[in-house]
UniProtKB/Swiss-Prot annotation:
Organism: Salmonella schwarzengrund (strain CVM19633)
One Gene Ontology biological process: D-arabinose catabolic process
Subunit record text: Homohexamer.
Function text: Converts the aldose L-fucose into the corresponding ketose L-fuculose.
GO molecular function terms noted in the UniProt entry: arabinose isomerase activity; L-fucose isomerase activity; manganese ion binding
Active site, renumbered: E337 (proton acceptor), D361 (proton acceptor)
Listed Gene3D superfamilies: 3.40.50.1070, L-fucose Isomerase, Chain A, domain 2, L-fucose/L-arabinose isomerase, C-terminal
EC number: 5.3.1.25
Protein name: L-fucose isomerase
Binding, Mn(2+): E337, D361, H528
Primary location recorded for the protein, binned into one broad class: cytoplasm
Family the entry assigns: Belongs to the L-fucose isomerase family.
Keywords: Carbohydrate metabolism, Cytoplasm, Fucose metabolism, Isomerase, Manganese, Metal-binding
Pathway: Carbohydrate degradation; L-fucose degradation; L-lactaldehyde and glycerone phosphate from L-fucose: step 1/3
Length: 591
Protein backbone atom coordinates (compact mmCIF):
# COMPACT_ATOMS: atom_id res chain seq x y z
CA UNK A 1 0.00 0.00 0.00
CA UNK A 2 1.22 3.47 -0.88
CA UNK A 3 1.75 5.63 2.18
CA UNK A 4 -0.20 8.89 1.96
CA UNK A 5 2.22 11.80 2.31
CA UNK A 6 1.99 14.17 5.25
CA UNK A 7 0.98 17.79 4.67
CA UNK A 8 3.76 20.36 4.56
CA UNK A 9 3.94 24.02 5.52
CA UNK A 10 4.70 26.44 2.72
CA UNK A 11 6.70 29.59 3.46
CA UNK A 12 6.10 32.52 1.10
CA UNK A 13 8.72 35.33 1.29
CA UNK A 14 7.13 38.42 -0.31
CA UNK A 15 9.06 41.50 -1.38
CA UNK A 16 8.84 44.96 -2.90
CA UNK A 17 9.29 44.32 -6.63
CA UNK A 18 10.91 47.63 -7.56
CA UNK A 19 14.35 47.01 -9.02
CA UNK A 20 17.29 49.40 -9.25
CA UNK A 21 18.07 49.04 -5.58
CA UNK A 22 14.85 48.41 -3.64
CA UNK A 23 14.28 44.70 -4.23
CA UNK A 24 17.99 43.98 -4.30
CA UNK A 25 18.46 45.49 -0.84
CA UNK A 26 15.69 43.30 0.62
CA UNK A 27 16.30 39.89 -0.95
CA UNK A 28 18.59 38.50 1.74
CA UNK A 29 16.59 39.83 4.70
CA UNK A 30 13.30 38.56 3.28
CA UNK A 31 14.60 35.10 2.45
CA UNK A 32 16.26 34.88 5.87
CA UNK A 33 12.86 35.51 7.49
CA UNK A 34 11.50 32.56 5.53
CA UNK A 35 14.42 30.34 6.52
CA UNK A 36 14.15 31.34 10.19
CA UNK A 37 10.42 30.58 10.19
CA UNK A 38 11.01 27.18 8.61
CA UNK A 39 13.80 26.38 11.08
CA UNK A 40 11.61 27.30 14.05
CA UNK A 41 8.73 25.12 12.92
CA UNK A 42 10.95 22.19 12.02
CA UNK A 43 12.63 22.35 15.42
CA UNK A 44 9.56 22.86 17.61
CA UNK A 45 6.69 20.95 15.95
CA UNK A 46 6.09 17.38 14.89
CA UNK A 47 3.19 15.69 13.18
CA UNK A 48 0.94 13.65 15.47
CA UNK A 49 2.62 10.53 14.10
CA UNK A 50 5.97 11.84 15.34
CA UNK A 51 7.42 12.69 11.94
CA UNK A 52 9.30 15.95 11.55
CA UNK A 53 7.31 18.72 9.90
CA UNK A 54 8.61 19.64 6.47
CA UNK A 55 8.61 23.25 5.32
CA UNK A 56 8.73 24.21 1.65
CA UNK A 57 10.09 27.68 0.82
CA UNK A 58 9.24 29.38 -2.46
CA UNK A 59 12.14 29.28 -4.92
CA UNK A 60 12.26 33.08 -5.12
CA UNK A 61 10.87 36.00 -3.23
CA UNK A 62 7.39 36.92 -4.44
CA UNK A 63 6.83 40.42 -5.81
CA UNK A 64 3.77 39.93 -7.99
CA UNK A 65 1.45 37.67 -9.91
CA UNK A 66 4.07 35.68 -11.85
CA UNK A 67 6.18 34.71 -8.85
CA UNK A 68 3.06 34.07 -6.79
CA UNK A 69 1.84 31.63 -9.45
CA UNK A 70 5.23 29.91 -9.58
CA UNK A 71 5.14 29.50 -5.81
CA UNK A 72 1.63 28.04 -5.97
CA UNK A 73 2.71 25.54 -8.61
CA UNK A 74 5.55 24.36 -6.38
CA UNK A 75 3.30 24.12 -3.32
CA UNK A 76 0.61 22.22 -5.22
CA UNK A 77 3.14 19.59 -6.28
CA UNK A 78 4.49 19.10 -2.76
CA UNK A 79 1.30 18.65 -0.70
CA UNK A 80 1.52 22.00 1.07
CA UNK A 81 -1.53 22.28 3.31
CA UNK A 82 -0.69 25.43 5.30
CA UNK A 83 1.06 28.65 4.29
CA UNK A 84 2.89 31.42 6.12
CA UNK A 85 3.74 34.59 4.22
CA UNK A 86 6.67 36.61 5.62
CA UNK A 87 8.02 40.05 4.79
CA UNK A 88 10.08 42.88 6.30
CA UNK A 89 8.83 45.49 3.84
CA UNK A 90 6.09 46.97 1.71
CA UNK A 91 4.84 44.65 -1.05
CA UNK A 92 1.85 44.68 -3.35
CA UNK A 93 -1.06 43.40 -1.26
CA UNK A 94 -3.59 41.48 -3.33
CA UNK A 95 -0.97 40.66 -5.97
CA UNK A 96 1.11 38.59 -3.57
CA UNK A 97 -1.34 36.89 -1.19
CA UNK A 98 -2.15 33.17 -1.04
CA UNK A 99 -5.59 32.84 -2.64
CA UNK A 100 -6.33 29.17 -1.85
CA UNK A 101 -9.57 29.40 0.19
CA UNK A 102 -9.19 25.97 1.81
CA UNK A 103 -5.67 26.40 3.15
CA UNK A 104 -5.03 27.99 6.56
CA UNK A 105 -2.81 31.03 6.07
CA UNK A 106 -0.92 33.55 8.16
CA UNK A 107 1.15 36.65 7.39
CA UNK A 108 4.12 37.76 9.48
CA UNK A 109 4.92 41.41 8.92
CA UNK A 110 8.28 42.33 10.49
CA UNK A 111 8.02 45.16 13.02
CA UNK A 112 10.83 47.42 11.84
CA UNK A 113 11.25 51.09 10.97
CA UNK A 114 13.52 50.94 7.93
CA UNK A 115 10.85 49.32 5.76
CA UNK A 116 7.07 49.20 6.37
CA UNK A 117 6.40 45.49 7.00
CA UNK A 118 3.38 46.48 9.06
CA UNK A 119 1.93 48.43 6.15
CA UNK A 120 2.08 45.40 3.87
CA UNK A 121 0.58 43.25 6.62
CA UNK A 122 -2.37 45.61 6.97
CA UNK A 123 -2.85 45.94 3.21
CA UNK A 124 -2.68 42.20 2.62
CA UNK A 125 -5.08 41.46 5.47
CA UNK A 126 -7.50 44.03 4.05
CA UNK A 127 -7.38 42.19 0.74
CA UNK A 128 -8.00 38.87 2.48
CA UNK A 129 -10.99 40.34 4.32
CA UNK A 130 -12.44 41.92 1.20
CA UNK A 131 -12.09 38.69 -0.78
CA UNK A 132 -13.57 36.51 1.98
CA UNK A 133 -10.40 34.50 2.58
CA UNK A 134 -9.52 34.96 6.28
CA UNK A 135 -5.86 35.06 7.31
CA UNK A 136 -4.04 35.25 10.64
CA UNK A 137 -1.97 38.31 11.50
CA UNK A 138 1.49 38.06 13.08
CA UNK A 139 3.16 41.31 14.11
CA UNK A 140 5.76 41.61 16.86
CA UNK A 141 5.01 43.79 19.86
CA UNK A 142 8.39 45.50 19.85
CA UNK A 143 10.34 47.19 17.05
CA UNK A 144 13.36 45.22 15.81
CA UNK A 145 16.45 46.45 14.01
CA UNK A 146 16.67 45.58 10.34
CA UNK A 147 19.63 43.25 10.89
CA UNK A 148 17.98 41.44 13.84
CA UNK A 149 17.34 37.89 12.64
CA UNK A 150 15.84 36.63 15.90
CA UNK A 151 12.17 35.70 16.24
CA UNK A 152 10.63 37.47 19.27
CA UNK A 153 8.80 35.32 21.81
CA UNK A 154 5.36 36.74 20.97
CA UNK A 155 5.91 36.14 17.25
CA UNK A 156 7.16 32.63 17.95
CA UNK A 157 4.07 31.84 20.03
CA UNK A 158 1.75 32.89 17.20
CA UNK A 159 3.77 31.13 14.51
CA UNK A 160 3.74 27.87 16.45
CA UNK A 161 0.07 28.10 17.47
CA UNK A 162 -0.91 28.79 13.88
CA UNK A 163 1.29 25.98 12.57
CA UNK A 164 -0.06 23.41 15.04
CA UNK A 165 -3.66 24.25 14.26
CA UNK A 166 -3.06 24.56 10.53
CA UNK A 167 -1.39 21.16 10.36
CA UNK A 168 -4.34 19.66 12.24
CA UNK A 169 -6.68 21.06 9.58
CA UNK A 170 -4.51 19.76 6.75
CA UNK A 171 -4.01 16.36 8.38
CA UNK A 172 -7.74 15.71 8.79
CA UNK A 173 -8.63 16.71 5.24
CA UNK A 174 -9.33 13.73 3.00
CA UNK A 175 -9.36 11.20 5.85
CA UNK A 176 -12.36 9.29 7.17
CA UNK A 177 -14.23 8.62 10.39
CA UNK A 178 -14.91 4.89 10.71
CA UNK A 179 -18.32 4.33 12.28
CA UNK A 180 -18.41 0.71 13.47
CA UNK A 181 -22.07 0.20 14.24
CA UNK A 182 -24.73 2.85 14.60
CA UNK A 183 -26.48 4.68 17.41
CA UNK A 184 -25.57 3.51 20.90
CA UNK A 185 -28.34 3.76 23.49
CA UNK A 186 -29.79 6.89 21.91
CA UNK A 187 -26.59 8.92 22.39
CA UNK A 188 -26.83 11.89 20.02
CA UNK A 189 -23.11 11.95 19.25
CA UNK A 190 -23.44 8.48 17.72
CA UNK A 191 -26.01 9.78 15.23
CA UNK A 192 -23.08 10.37 12.90
CA UNK A 193 -23.58 13.58 10.89
CA UNK A 194 -22.00 13.14 7.46
CA UNK A 195 -22.51 16.80 6.57
CA UNK A 196 -20.54 17.92 9.62
CA UNK A 197 -17.56 15.74 8.73
CA UNK A 198 -17.66 16.71 5.06
CA UNK A 199 -18.36 20.45 5.37
CA UNK A 200 -16.38 21.40 8.46
CA UNK A 201 -13.53 18.85 8.54
CA UNK A 202 -13.12 17.82 4.90
CA UNK A 203 -13.55 14.18 5.94
CA UNK A 204 -15.72 11.28 4.83
CA UNK A 205 -17.69 8.88 6.99
CA UNK A 206 -17.25 5.15 6.46
CA UNK A 207 -20.19 3.29 8.01
CA UNK A 208 -19.56 -0.39 8.75
CA UNK A 209 -21.92 -2.73 10.56
CA UNK A 210 -20.59 -4.48 13.66
CA UNK A 211 -21.09 -7.78 11.82
CA UNK A 212 -17.95 -6.90 9.85
CA UNK A 213 -15.99 -7.06 13.11
CA UNK A 214 -17.68 -10.38 13.88
CA UNK A 215 -16.76 -11.69 10.41
CA UNK A 216 -13.13 -10.72 10.75
CA UNK A 217 -12.86 -12.44 14.12
CA UNK A 218 -14.75 -15.59 13.12
CA UNK A 219 -13.05 -16.01 9.74
CA UNK A 220 -9.57 -15.24 11.10
CA UNK A 221 -9.11 -12.12 9.01
CA UNK A 222 -6.20 -11.00 11.14
CA UNK A 223 -2.54 -11.76 11.74
CA UNK A 224 -2.63 -14.98 13.79
CA UNK A 225 1.01 -14.65 14.81
CA UNK A 226 0.30 -11.18 16.14
CA UNK A 227 -2.59 -12.54 18.23
CA UNK A 228 -0.22 -14.93 19.98
CA UNK A 229 2.15 -12.04 20.62
CA UNK A 230 -0.70 -9.94 22.03
CA UNK A 231 -1.83 -12.73 24.34
CA UNK A 232 1.71 -13.27 25.63
CA UNK A 233 2.07 -9.53 26.21
CA UNK A 234 -1.22 -9.42 28.13
CA UNK A 235 -0.17 -12.43 30.22
CA UNK A 236 2.98 -10.56 31.18
CA UNK A 237 1.51 -7.11 31.75
CA UNK A 238 -2.14 -7.38 32.77
CA UNK A 239 -2.93 -7.15 36.46
CA UNK A 240 -6.49 -8.27 37.11
CA UNK A 241 -8.86 -6.56 39.51
CA UNK A 242 -11.59 -7.96 41.69
CA UNK A 243 -14.51 -9.69 40.00
CA UNK A 244 -17.46 -7.88 41.55
CA UNK A 245 -20.09 -9.98 39.78
CA UNK A 246 -22.52 -12.20 41.65
CA UNK A 247 -21.42 -15.83 41.77
CA UNK A 248 -23.84 -16.95 39.04
CA UNK A 249 -22.26 -14.45 36.63
CA UNK A 250 -18.60 -15.17 37.33
CA UNK A 251 -16.73 -16.85 34.49
CA UNK A 252 -14.31 -19.74 34.86
CA UNK A 253 -10.69 -19.60 33.76
CA UNK A 254 -11.35 -20.92 30.25
CA UNK A 255 -14.21 -18.48 29.73
CA UNK A 256 -12.09 -15.58 30.93
CA UNK A 257 -9.33 -16.61 28.54
CA UNK A 258 -11.79 -16.59 25.66
CA UNK A 259 -12.99 -13.12 26.66
CA UNK A 260 -9.42 -11.82 26.77
CA UNK A 261 -8.63 -13.34 23.38
CA UNK A 262 -11.68 -11.80 21.74
CA UNK A 263 -11.00 -8.42 23.37
CA UNK A 264 -7.49 -8.36 21.92
CA UNK A 265 -8.82 -9.49 18.55
CA UNK A 266 -11.28 -6.62 18.58
CA UNK A 267 -8.39 -4.19 19.04
CA UNK A 268 -6.45 -5.77 16.18
CA UNK A 269 -9.41 -5.87 13.80
CA UNK A 270 -10.61 -2.31 14.52
CA UNK A 271 -7.04 -1.10 13.95
CA UNK A 272 -6.84 -3.04 10.68
CA UNK A 273 -10.18 -1.59 9.58
CA UNK A 274 -8.87 1.90 10.30
CA UNK A 275 -5.43 1.84 8.71
CA UNK A 276 -5.11 -1.45 6.87
CA UNK A 277 -2.62 -4.27 7.38
CA UNK A 278 -0.37 -5.59 4.61
CA UNK A 279 -0.16 -8.96 6.40
CA UNK A 280 -3.75 -9.58 5.34
CA UNK A 281 -2.77 -9.12 1.71
CA UNK A 282 -0.14 -11.82 2.19
CA UNK A 283 -3.02 -14.12 3.22
CA UNK A 284 -4.88 -13.29 0.00
CA UNK A 285 -7.23 -10.83 1.71
CA UNK A 286 -6.31 -7.83 -0.41
CA UNK A 287 -9.57 -5.89 -0.01
CA UNK A 288 -9.53 -6.19 3.77
CA UNK A 289 -5.84 -5.29 3.89
CA UNK A 290 -6.49 -1.76 2.61
CA UNK A 291 -8.50 -0.44 5.56
CA UNK A 292 -10.71 2.63 5.37
CA UNK A 293 -8.18 5.49 5.57
CA UNK A 294 -9.59 6.36 9.00
CA UNK A 295 -7.93 8.97 11.20
CA UNK A 296 -10.57 8.35 13.88
CA UNK A 297 -13.18 5.71 14.64
CA UNK A 298 -16.03 4.86 16.95
CA UNK A 299 -17.45 1.55 18.14
CA UNK A 300 -21.15 1.34 19.03
CA UNK A 301 -20.88 -1.68 21.31
CA UNK A 302 -23.85 -1.12 23.54
CA UNK A 303 -26.09 -2.85 23.44
CA UNK A 304 -26.38 -4.85 20.23
CA UNK A 305 -22.83 -6.16 20.59
CA UNK A 306 -22.26 -6.14 24.34
CA UNK A 307 -25.37 -8.12 25.25
CA UNK A 308 -23.72 -11.20 23.77
CA UNK A 309 -20.06 -10.43 23.01
CA UNK A 310 -17.22 -8.93 25.10
CA UNK A 311 -17.42 -5.16 25.37
CA UNK A 312 -15.08 -2.74 23.65
CA UNK A 313 -13.36 -1.49 26.80
CA UNK A 314 -10.09 -3.40 26.41
CA UNK A 315 -9.87 -2.77 22.67
CA UNK A 316 -10.64 0.94 22.99
CA UNK A 317 -8.33 1.47 25.97
CA UNK A 318 -5.40 -0.18 24.21
CA UNK A 319 -5.98 1.51 20.86
CA UNK A 320 -6.28 4.93 22.50
CA UNK A 321 -3.03 4.37 24.42
CA UNK A 322 0.51 5.07 23.23
CA UNK A 323 1.69 1.48 23.58
CA UNK A 324 0.66 -2.14 23.16
CA UNK A 325 2.27 -5.49 22.31
CA UNK A 326 4.03 -3.86 19.36
CA UNK A 327 5.74 -1.37 21.67
CA UNK A 328 5.41 2.39 21.89
CA UNK A 329 3.52 3.90 18.96
CA UNK A 330 1.13 6.67 17.96
CA UNK A 331 -2.19 6.36 19.80
CA UNK A 332 -5.32 5.82 17.77
CA UNK A 333 -8.53 7.79 18.23
CA UNK A 334 -11.45 5.46 18.99
CA UNK A 335 -14.63 6.82 20.53
CA UNK A 336 -16.64 4.77 22.98
CA UNK A 337 -20.29 4.16 22.07
CA UNK A 338 -19.49 5.58 18.61
CA UNK A 339 -19.81 9.10 20.01
CA UNK A 340 -18.41 10.70 16.89
CA UNK A 341 -18.53 14.23 18.30
CA UNK A 342 -16.42 13.24 21.29
CA UNK A 343 -14.25 11.39 18.80
CA UNK A 344 -13.72 14.66 16.94
CA UNK A 345 -12.69 16.38 20.18
CA UNK A 346 -10.23 13.52 20.75
CA UNK A 347 -8.98 13.94 17.19
CA UNK A 348 -8.45 17.68 17.69
CA UNK A 349 -6.53 17.08 20.91
CA UNK A 350 -4.36 14.37 19.41
CA UNK A 351 -3.53 16.37 16.31
CA UNK A 352 -2.63 19.46 18.35
CA UNK A 353 -0.48 17.70 20.96
CA UNK A 354 0.51 14.29 19.60
CA UNK A 355 -0.65 12.74 22.87
CA UNK A 356 -3.19 10.10 23.85
CA UNK A 357 -6.63 11.34 24.91
CA UNK A 358 -8.86 10.49 27.87
CA UNK A 359 -12.46 9.73 26.86
CA UNK A 360 -14.82 10.02 29.82
CA UNK A 361 -18.35 10.49 31.03
CA UNK A 362 -18.84 13.89 32.64
CA UNK A 363 -20.43 11.92 35.41
CA UNK A 364 -20.96 13.77 38.66
CA UNK A 365 -20.49 17.19 40.22
CA UNK A 366 -19.43 16.86 43.84
CA UNK A 367 -19.93 20.03 45.86
CA UNK A 368 -17.71 20.63 48.91
CA UNK A 369 -20.79 20.24 51.09
CA UNK A 370 -21.81 16.93 49.53
CA UNK A 371 -18.29 15.52 49.83
CA UNK A 372 -18.10 16.45 53.49
CA UNK A 373 -21.54 14.99 54.17
CA UNK A 374 -20.65 11.67 52.54
CA UNK A 375 -17.03 11.27 53.66
CA UNK A 376 -16.71 13.46 56.74
CA UNK A 377 -13.71 15.13 55.12
CA UNK A 378 -13.36 18.55 53.51
CA UNK A 379 -12.06 19.20 50.01
CA UNK A 380 -8.94 21.35 49.86
CA UNK A 381 -6.37 22.79 47.46
CA UNK A 382 -7.38 22.67 43.80
CA UNK A 383 -10.51 20.79 44.82
CA UNK A 384 -11.75 23.28 47.43
CA UNK A 385 -14.60 24.62 45.26
CA UNK A 386 -15.82 21.19 44.18
CA UNK A 387 -14.85 18.56 41.63
CA UNK A 388 -16.22 16.76 38.59
CA UNK A 389 -15.96 12.99 38.44
CA UNK A 390 -14.77 11.97 34.97
CA UNK A 391 -15.24 8.24 34.55
CA UNK A 392 -16.24 5.80 31.83
CA UNK A 393 -16.32 2.04 31.49
CA UNK A 394 -12.63 1.46 31.05
CA UNK A 395 -11.96 2.88 27.58
CA UNK A 396 -9.72 5.83 28.51
CA UNK A 397 -6.11 5.78 27.30
CA UNK A 398 -3.85 4.09 29.85
CA UNK A 399 -1.53 7.09 29.55
CA UNK A 400 -4.20 8.81 31.64
CA UNK A 401 -2.77 7.28 34.81
CA UNK A 402 -0.10 9.99 34.35
CA UNK A 403 2.83 7.77 35.28
CA UNK A 404 4.96 9.47 32.64
CA UNK A 405 7.19 12.34 33.78
CA UNK A 406 8.07 15.71 32.30
CA UNK A 407 11.48 17.39 32.41
CA UNK A 408 10.79 18.53 35.98
CA UNK A 409 9.75 15.07 37.13
CA UNK A 410 6.06 15.97 37.32
CA UNK A 411 3.30 13.58 36.22
CA UNK A 412 2.09 14.10 32.67
CA UNK A 413 1.06 12.47 29.38
CA UNK A 414 3.72 12.76 26.69
CA UNK A 415 3.69 12.39 22.91
CA UNK A 416 4.65 8.83 22.06
CA UNK A 417 8.08 9.76 20.69
CA UNK A 418 9.07 11.01 24.16
CA UNK A 419 7.74 8.05 26.16
CA UNK A 420 10.24 5.56 27.56
CA UNK A 421 9.52 1.86 27.93
CA UNK A 422 9.74 2.31 31.70
CA UNK A 423 6.97 4.92 31.57
CA UNK A 424 4.77 2.69 29.42
CA UNK A 425 5.35 -0.15 31.87
CA UNK A 426 4.46 2.14 34.78
CA UNK A 427 1.12 3.02 33.16
CA UNK A 428 0.37 -0.67 32.68
CA UNK A 429 1.39 -1.42 36.27
CA UNK A 430 -0.99 1.29 37.51
CA UNK A 431 -3.91 -0.30 35.65
CA UNK A 432 -6.13 -3.12 36.82
CA UNK A 433 -8.28 -5.08 34.39
CA UNK A 434 -11.60 -5.75 36.06
CA UNK A 435 -14.18 -8.26 34.80
CA UNK A 436 -17.06 -6.30 33.31
CA UNK A 437 -20.16 -5.95 35.44
CA UNK A 438 -22.75 -8.39 34.08
CA UNK A 439 -25.71 -6.05 34.53
CA UNK A 440 -24.06 -3.62 32.12
CA UNK A 441 -22.22 -6.04 29.85
CA UNK A 442 -23.82 -9.46 29.54
CA UNK A 443 -21.20 -10.56 27.04
CA UNK A 444 -18.39 -9.90 29.49
CA UNK A 445 -15.17 -8.07 28.87
CA UNK A 446 -12.47 -6.36 30.90
CA UNK A 447 -12.62 -2.74 32.01
CA UNK A 448 -9.39 -0.91 32.71
CA UNK A 449 -9.21 0.76 36.10
CA UNK A 450 -6.72 3.45 37.09
CA UNK A 451 -6.65 6.73 38.99
CA UNK A 452 -5.17 9.82 37.36
CA UNK A 453 -2.45 11.45 39.44
CA UNK A 454 -3.32 14.88 40.84
CA UNK A 455 -2.04 18.34 39.99
CA UNK A 456 -1.79 17.69 36.26
CA UNK A 457 -3.00 20.48 33.93
CA UNK A 458 -5.71 19.33 31.52
CA UNK A 459 -8.04 20.84 28.95
CA UNK A 460 -11.51 19.32 28.73
CA UNK A 461 -13.29 19.67 25.38
CA UNK A 462 -16.44 18.62 23.58
CA UNK A 463 -18.03 19.25 20.17
CA UNK A 464 -21.83 19.52 20.01
CA UNK A 465 -24.15 20.06 17.06
CA UNK A 466 -26.99 22.55 17.49
CA UNK A 467 -29.83 22.47 14.97
CA UNK A 468 -29.96 25.72 13.03
CA UNK A 469 -26.47 26.70 14.19
CA UNK A 470 -24.15 23.82 13.43
CA UNK A 471 -21.18 22.57 15.46
CA UNK A 472 -19.90 24.38 18.55
CA UNK A 473 -16.87 23.68 20.74
CA UNK A 474 -16.67 23.73 24.53
CA UNK A 475 -13.38 24.15 26.39
CA UNK A 476 -12.60 23.99 30.11
CA UNK A 477 -9.03 24.22 31.34
CA UNK A 478 -8.30 22.86 34.79
CA UNK A 479 -6.38 20.25 36.76
CA UNK A 480 -6.65 16.68 37.89
CA UNK A 481 -7.03 16.40 41.64
CA UNK A 482 -5.65 13.87 44.10
CA UNK A 483 -8.06 13.12 46.93
CA UNK A 484 -7.18 11.44 50.22
CA UNK A 485 -7.42 7.69 49.68
CA UNK A 486 -10.33 7.15 52.03
CA UNK A 487 -12.28 9.97 50.40
CA UNK A 488 -11.57 8.67 46.90
CA UNK A 489 -12.56 5.13 47.83
CA UNK A 490 -15.89 6.25 49.26
CA UNK A 491 -16.79 8.48 46.32
CA UNK A 492 -15.53 6.04 43.69
CA UNK A 493 -17.53 3.17 45.15
CA UNK A 494 -20.74 5.15 44.73
CA UNK A 495 -20.38 4.96 40.92
CA UNK A 496 -18.37 2.00 39.66
CA UNK A 497 -15.00 1.16 41.12
CA UNK A 498 -14.07 -1.07 38.16
CA UNK A 499 -13.63 1.93 35.87
CA UNK A 500 -10.86 4.56 35.49
CA UNK A 501 -11.30 7.84 37.36
CA UNK A 502 -10.06 11.38 36.92
CA UNK A 503 -11.11 13.95 39.52
CA UNK A 504 -11.22 17.25 37.65
CA UNK A 505 -11.24 20.82 38.96
CA UNK A 506 -11.84 23.44 36.25
CA UNK A 507 -10.22 26.86 36.52
CA UNK A 508 -12.91 29.31 37.59
CA UNK A 509 -13.34 32.90 36.42
CA UNK A 510 -16.33 33.89 38.55
CA UNK A 511 -18.37 34.61 35.42
CA UNK A 512 -20.89 32.78 33.24
CA UNK A 513 -20.31 29.04 32.88
CA UNK A 514 -17.16 29.36 34.99
CA UNK A 515 -18.83 31.08 37.93
CA UNK A 516 -18.33 27.90 39.94
CA UNK A 517 -17.72 24.20 39.35
CA UNK A 518 -21.45 23.48 39.35
CA UNK A 519 -21.89 25.93 36.46
CA UNK A 520 -19.25 24.13 34.40
CA UNK A 521 -21.10 20.84 34.85
CA UNK A 522 -24.48 22.48 34.23
CA UNK A 523 -23.32 24.12 30.98
CA UNK A 524 -21.61 21.05 29.55
CA UNK A 525 -23.44 20.15 26.36
CA UNK A 526 -23.39 16.35 26.46
CA UNK A 527 -22.68 13.32 28.62
CA UNK A 528 -19.13 12.86 27.34
CA UNK A 529 -15.96 14.93 27.34
CA UNK A 530 -12.28 14.58 26.45
CA UNK A 531 -9.21 15.41 28.51
CA UNK A 532 -6.13 16.61 26.63
CA UNK A 533 -2.89 17.14 28.52
CA UNK A 534 -1.85 20.72 29.27
CA UNK A 535 -3.63 24.04 29.19
CA UNK A 536 -4.01 24.08 25.42
CA UNK A 537 -7.40 25.75 25.08
CA UNK A 538 -5.86 28.54 23.01
CA UNK A 539 -4.76 26.01 20.39
CA UNK A 540 -8.29 24.58 20.25
CA UNK A 541 -9.70 28.10 19.77
CA UNK A 542 -7.35 28.78 16.85
CA UNK A 543 -8.18 25.43 15.26
CA UNK A 544 -11.92 26.01 15.69
CA UNK A 545 -11.67 29.39 13.98
CA UNK A 546 -9.88 27.83 11.02
CA UNK A 547 -12.73 25.32 10.66
CA UNK A 548 -15.43 27.97 11.35
CA UNK A 549 -16.64 26.25 14.52
CA UNK A 550 -17.64 28.85 17.13
CA UNK A 551 -16.52 28.34 20.72
CA UNK A 552 -19.53 28.56 23.02
CA UNK A 553 -17.73 28.11 26.34
CA UNK A 554 -14.12 28.56 27.43
CA UNK A 555 -11.96 29.87 30.26
CA UNK A 556 -8.87 30.81 28.23
CA UNK A 557 -7.25 34.17 28.97
CA UNK A 558 -8.24 36.75 26.36
CA UNK A 559 -4.60 37.58 25.60
CA UNK A 560 -4.07 34.02 24.33
CA UNK A 561 -7.03 33.99 21.94
CA UNK A 562 -5.77 33.94 18.36
CA UNK A 563 -8.20 34.06 15.46
CA UNK A 564 -8.08 35.42 11.89
CA UNK A 565 -7.82 39.20 11.67
CA UNK A 566 -11.22 39.52 9.95
CA UNK A 567 -12.94 38.38 13.15
CA UNK A 568 -12.31 41.90 14.53
CA UNK A 569 -14.67 43.34 11.90
CA UNK A 570 -17.59 41.31 13.25
CA UNK A 571 -18.27 43.42 16.35
CA UNK A 572 -16.52 44.48 19.54
CA UNK A 573 -17.34 41.56 21.85
CA UNK A 574 -14.76 38.88 21.20
CA UNK A 575 -17.03 35.84 21.53
CA UNK A 576 -19.83 37.44 19.53
CA UNK A 577 -17.25 38.13 16.82
CA UNK A 578 -16.55 34.41 16.67
CA UNK A 579 -20.19 33.46 16.14
CA UNK A 580 -20.80 36.13 13.53
CA UNK A 581 -17.60 35.37 11.62
CA UNK A 582 -18.23 31.62 11.58
CA UNK A 583 -21.77 32.25 10.33
CA UNK A 584 -20.56 34.77 7.74
CA UNK A 585 -17.85 32.58 6.23
CA UNK A 586 -19.58 29.24 6.72
CA UNK A 587 -17.84 25.88 7.07
CA UNK A 588 -14.35 25.63 5.61
CA UNK A 589 -15.35 23.01 3.04
CA UNK A 590 -18.76 24.41 2.17
CA UNK A 591 -21.13 21.67 0.96
Amino acid sequence: MKKISLPKIGIRPVIDGRRMGVRESLEEQTMNMAKATAALITEKIRHACGAQVECVIADTCIAGMAESAACEEKFSSQNVGVTITVTPCWCYGSETIDMDPMRPKAIWGFNGTERPGAVYLAAALAAHSQKGIPAFSIYGHDVQDADDTSIPADVEEKLLRFARAGLAVASMKGKSYLSVGGVSMGIAGSIVDHNFFESWLGMKVQAVDMTELRRRIDQKIYDEAELEMALAWADKNFRYGEDQNASQYKRNEAQNRAVLKESLLMAMCIRDMMQGNKTLADKGLVEESLGYNAIAAGFQGQRHWTDQYPNGDTAEALLNSSFDWNGIREPFVVATENDSLNGVAMLFGHQLTGTAQIFADVRTYWSPEAVERVTGQALSGLAEHGIIHLINSGSAALDGACKQRDSEGKPTMKPHWEISQQEADACLAATEWCPAIHEYFRGGGYSSRFLTEGGVPFTMTRVNIIKGLGPVLQIAEGWSVELPKAMHDQLDARTNSTWPTTWFAPRLTGKGPFTDVYSVMANWGANHGVLTIGHVGADFITLAAMLRIPVCMHNVEEAKIYRPSAWAAHGMDIEGQDYRACQNYGPLYKR
